[in-house]
Amino acid sequence: MFNLSLHGDPYPQQPGHLQLSWLDRMGERVRLAWMRHKQVNGWVLGRMAKRVLKAQTERESMTPEALREDLQRLTLALRRDGLEDALVEQAFAHVRLTAQRVLGMAHFPVQLKGGYIMLMGYLAEMDTGEGKTLTATLPAATAALAGFTVHVVTVNEYLARRDAQLMTPLYRALGVTTGVVTESMDSDEKQLGYRANVVYCTSKTLVFDYLRDRIQLGERMKPMAMAFDALVGGGRGQVMLQGLQYAIVDEADSIFVDEARTPLIISAPSKDASELAFLHTAWSLSQQLQQGQDYTLSGEEPPRITEAGSAQLAQLCVDLPPVWQGQHRREEAVAQALTAQHSFDRDVHYIIRDDKVMVVDETTGRVMPDRAWERGLQQLIEIKEGVAVTPPKETLAKISFQLFFRRFLRLSGMSGTCREVGGEIAEVYGLGVVRVAPNRPSKRKNLPIALYAWRAQADAAVVQAVRRCHMLGQPVLVGTRSIAASELLSQSFSEAGLPHRVLNAKQDQEENTIIAEAGYKGGITIATNMAGRGTDIKLSKEVQACGGLHVILTERHDNRRVDRQLAGRCARQGDPGSWQEILSLEDELTQKFLPLLGRTLRAWLALMPHFFLARWLGMVYYRWAQSYADRGHRRVRRQLMKTDFQLRQSLSFTGEME
């Protein structure tokens, strides 16, 4: 049972957590496993689903007036007694019956199970296409009826707006208010959106608005201080959120894991005018160093300045101001400039729009116009691209996803690809992962992986595969890793006479139209990660007869879960569909990790393209490179969390806020 008294706390949230010892972490893992087995095992979930269906049957014959009275009685009971199982089952019955009448959709038993798992505070792993948007209405509406503010957190604004628009009629019929909050809204619009019972928003918008509340309130963000402000009629209107009560995180592995590598920072223009000149000098110095002699590059590691490079820099800085005479400071600045030059590429990590450098989210493939890199990296990339340089920023507040989501009174989530990171999610967020079987067996056909030595060979094979499907009338979705790769492949398709659409961060305003047409007969769509998580491509009966949607992956990402999300765009809810990988040993992953081994295997595969051992060893190397990249990101997340804990401990000692 979940019953928290929120009265007297104007901004309810969990207190900050201290880092646990390894023994405490092991104990917590054991406790989570036992609670998961006890609360959400198959027998419990099966009985719950049957009781919900029975409760719905009892209410189907009620008049509208009697049904409203029953819902009012249930609402009062939920607010008085909390989320007791008997009350939850009745609430689920109301939600299912209302969805059936208002939306024309009734929750399947597997969706009832997924909703219950989330309401109990777990992460439900449901296959792509199983209807997670509708499933989320069960815990969201039930918690809202019980008096809690619910945040339904998604990975992008397109999904937040779409899901809210689809489900608002259901919530309205239940007497629950809904709101959508996007980054482009002003403070008044956001405040109004956050006042709703169920709020749809993105993870970044939610975190940044929380940080803005902290900046606004400072040390007054404490129950006693805020209660006093509310008593005297002040303070409450200053904040946007109503606290951190209950969050349902969609695509939870993306938000909890993939996006958790960098902290969320609110900054303001720096008052130090000399900092911009300092960065220009750093860039100028970096251009006078020679790769291989003065600095080295290795995979995803930052550029490393050699002893010769250190001596060269010391010589170049002899006549520069005193700030350049310290070895550590100058080498750190020049290394950052080299990072901007070599590690960040246009149309991969950022785009140029309206003479501005705009960050592209690696995970979602979307432009983040209001985001910027820290520690001068944004300005150095702007210098590199020759666009207007924005003033450097100073940090006002920062927090990591790991620390932020642990502050919710209750946290839950759902995803189709979280089993690989279940241990990390349990350790960091205290969330157990519960697998939910699909409603219908998958009809997806997994075609053999095609591996080529060179990217040009792989692209030619992609063109041939797409042409075959196009002639059969089968729609094709081709996934690429970057904007540049999507545009290069588009050029190959145009030369081959294949009509197609391209969806990447440069065409983000046409997203709805492109997605709507991606399932048309004979349609060809090239897309980055924007067509990954949450994208539902509708198919006609005619297209299903042609074999359904065919998905081609042209390059693997840094973790296998992103690839699986793309595969999940086809064969949804029992529809037919197929999936294929056409890769090369020239792909980005193979360029970063043990490149000498990659070149050797590439030369061997080029000489003997049909030799089984050459292809097999090539795929072993490719999988290893992907695994190595994933482990590297995991190390970064652990280090960020460790730093976050250390910062919090030091600030709590000094009395400052993080």
Swiss-Prot record:
Binding site residues for ATP: Q111, G129, E130, G131, K132, T133, D536
UniProt family annotation: Belongs to the SecA family.
KW Cell membrane (keyword) present: yes
Superkingdom of source: Bacteria
Topology class, membrane: Peripheral membrane protein
GO MF annotation terms: ATP binding; protein-exporting ATPase activity
Enzyme class, spelled out: translocase
Function summary: Part of the Sec protein translocase complex. Interacts with the SecYEG preprotein conducting channel. Has a central role in coupling the hydrolysis of ATP to the transfer of proteins into and across the cell membrane, serving both as a receptor for the preprotein-SecB complex and as an ATP-driven molecular motor driving the stepwise translocation of polypeptide chains across the membrane.
InterPro entries documented for this protein: Helicase_ATP-bd, Helicase_C-like, P-loop_NTPase, SecA, SecA_CS, SecA_DEAD, SecA_motor_DEAD, SecA_preprotein_X-link_dom
Entry-linked HAMAP family: SecA
Keyword Cell inner membrane included in the entry's annotation: yes
Cellular compartment(s): Cell inner membrane; Cytoplasm
UniProt-recorded name of the protein: Protein translocase subunit SecA 3
Disulfide bonding pattern of the chain: none
Gene from which the chain derives: secA3
UniProt EC number: 7.4.2.8
One GO CC term on file: cytosol
Entry keyword set: ATP-binding, Cell inner membrane, Cell membrane, Cytoplasm, Membrane, Nucleotide-binding, Protein transport, Translocase, Translocation, Transport
Complexes and interactors: Monomer and homodimer. Part of the essential Sec protein translocation apparatus which comprises SecA, SecYEG and auxiliary proteins SecDF-YajC and YidC.
An individual GO BP term: intracellular protein transmembrane transport
Reactions the enzyme catalyzes: ATP + H2O + cellular proteinSide 1 = ADP + phosphate + cellular proteinSide 2
